[in-house]
Amino acid sequence: MVRRLLALSRPLYWLYEQRLLREVKRGPMPRHLGLILDGNRRYARALGLSPTKGHEFGVQKAYEVLEWCLEMGIKTVTVWVFSTDNFKRPPEEVETLMNLFLREAERMAEDHRILEHQVRVRFIGRREGFSPEVVRAIERLERRTEGHRGMFLNIALGYGGREEIVDAVKRLLLEAEARGLSPKEVAEGLTPEDIARHLYTAGLPDPDFIIRTSGEIRLSGFLLWQSAYSEFYFADVLWPEFRKIDFLRALRSYQARERRFGR
């Protein structure tokens, strides 16, 4: 009986997905979509699996969602993969994640989806704490795709929103010192635009829309500066379970909102 119901539900699911897809494609898309990929470990725990398996499922879902973004014509996507706080996790889990980052960076450099769709990949965050092998792999991927003019994909690795702002201020002060400016001169002339020009995402539009999975209703420091006027959507589903219908519903919610930008 259960199998029969499942068999009957699949065509209905597909029909609903196609109707939703047509509806959403008619509306405006975010220029820059932020994704907080949350829930891999809880998903694995619910299935009685190791955290490593949860992260493996999460990687495959990330590729799937990237394809959805390409289909919808979203030009810039930032995915938060690993925070500075994640270094505090058990050493064996961190080591597993490092191996996963190395493998996927090498894989993406040859991935036909990245190459065919001209996806430019850039990693944002601090690289201290990552092995030389991981750093070389992500730098190779960045070089391999730096001439691409399709989607711009930021992968936030070793990222923290507070750390990003601190790093931006440090760079700004060092540049000012090199130009012979005093701290007083820097303080008197400092503007929000000066800070923005030194962020990891400098030159890119701020995120219009940020989706977080797992039901957690917080940013946890993701793109703190850039998200001042972002719209948010908190999906009550773990990242590996995030379906295309969930993605389309999120975009539909974004399209229904009136963005005021503080006015």
Curated annotation (Swiss-Prot):
Disulfide linkage: none
GO biological process, one term: polyprenol biosynthetic process
Cofactor(s) recorded in Swiss-Prot or TrEMBL: Mg(2+)
Active-site residues, as the UniProt record annotates them: 38, 86
Key words, A-Z: Magnesium, Metal-binding, Transferase
Annotated EC: 2.5.1.-
Binding site for Mg(2+): 38, 231
Binding site for substrate: 39-42, 55, 83-85, 87, 89, 212, 218-220
Statement: the UniProt record of this protein carries the keyword Repeat: no
Matching InterPro entries: UPP_synth-like (IPR001441), UPP_synth-like_CS (IPR018520), UPP_synth-like_sf (IPR036424)
Top EC class, one word: transferase
Pfam family, one: Prenyltransf
Cofactor binding annotation: Binds 2 magnesium ions per subunit.
One function term, GO molecular function aspect: ditrans,polycis-polyprenyl diphosphate synthase [(2E,6E)-farnesyl diphosphate specific] activity
Alphabetized PANTHER family for the sequence: DEHYDRODOLICHYL DIPHOSPHATE SYNTHASE COMPLEX SUBUNIT DHDDS (PTHR10291:SF43), DEHYDRODOLICHYL DIPHOSPHATE SYNTHASE FAMILY MEMBER (PTHR10291)
Family matches, as HAMAP family: ISPT
Protein family (similarity comment): Belongs to the UPP synthase family.
UniProt cross-references to NCBIfam families, sorted A to Z: PRK14835.1, uppS
Quaternary state and interactors: Homodimer.
Function: Catalyzes the condensation of isopentenyl diphosphate (IPP) with allylic pyrophosphates generating different type of terpenoids.
UniProt-recorded name of the protein: Isoprenyl transferase
Species of the source: Thermus thermophilus (strain ATCC BAA-163 / DSM 7039 / HB27)
